[in-house]
Amino acid sequence: MSAQARAKRPWRGVLALDAAIDRRVTQPRKRGITMVIDKGIGPAALADIDAVAAPYIDHWKLAFGTSALMPPQVLADKLAFLRERGVLTYPGGTLLEAAVVQQHCRVFMQRAEELGFTAVEISDGTIDLPRDRRRRIIDCAREAGLVVITEVGKKDPQCQPEAAELAEQALDDLKWGSSFVIVEARESGRGIGIYDKTGELRSSFLEEIANLLGDKIDQLIWEAPQKEQQAALVARFGANVSLGNVAVNEVLALEALRAGLRFETLAAVADREKASGQWDPDMPEPDEGPATRESARQELRHD
């Protein structure tokens, strides 16, 4: 984070807040990705979100088949707006699965590029894809000039693969040219993948995937639509864990959680600081002195 960027923060100079925010890697990010799920907002709403949360948005997924139903000019305007800001855009994987069933994979990739998408999500959450077919679809997307994002896992709660299967598929996808791998959880985050039917994290399942991925773990994007899930993953992997299926209006809330500026993560930070002796609740705040206070006032006057 540059000094110039830090100086523009509303709460600059409050060292604890600066330190909390500085824990995050900055754009363009290769880890600590926030993937937003868009179920159909318009250009005005997109501009509003950009105005308040642009530094915290990395990927933008137009959910399931919504991009096929949107007015063409609206879709074009949204994709152009996001592309100008360096945000990776892709349609939901279900749309590609529908094209694969009709043997239209290559046409789909060409059309995605023409429409202005910069990436594509390749999944088999609904259909079954043989390994070789999946690899060839990845090749097809790359030949079309698209960044490849794959997804592992099934959407049906009754057909959930084991952790080792998910990890093996993720490693194969990365070897075949995928830039990131999303771990399926759907929009509900219940009974799918790393979550049980109540939405709680299946810790042993998660740890098995993490252990098998090893140093590739930063290329996983964990779908985490619920606040409690986001908090649990931040607690496990740190502020720079990659999270997906984040609601459009929850981007800033997630960033506050990452920075330890919400109850769910601040409590852990406070406990850690207290245990290490860095913070003593009984110790009064030191007097900064009039010179320091006057310097702060001068800084505010010259903004």
From Swiss-Prot:
One of its GO terms (biological process) is coenzyme M biosynthetic process. Its EC number is 4.4.1.19. Pathway: Cofactor biosynthesis; coenzyme M biosynthesis; sulfoacetaldehyde from phosphoenolpyruvate and sulfite: step 1/4. Residues 273-303 are annotated as: Disordered. InterPro entries: Aldolase_TIM (IPR013785), ComA_synth (IPR003830), ComA_synth_sf (IPR036112). It catalyses: (2R)-O-phospho-3-sulfolactate = phosphoenolpyruvate + sulfite + H(+). Keywords: Coenzyme M biosynthesis, Lyase, Plasmid. It comes from the Bacteria. Residues 290-303 have a biased composition (Basic and acidic residues). One of its GO terms (molecular function) is phosphosulfolactate synthase activity. Belongs to the phosphosulfolactate synthase family. In Xanthobacter strain Py2 coenzyme M plays a role in epoxide carboxylation by serving as the nucleophile for epoxide ring opening and the carrier of the C3 unit that is ultimately carboxylated to acetoacetate. Catalyzes the addition of sulfite to phosphoenolpyruvate (PEP) to yield (2R)-phospho-3-sulfolactate (PSL). This is Phosphosulfolactate synthase.
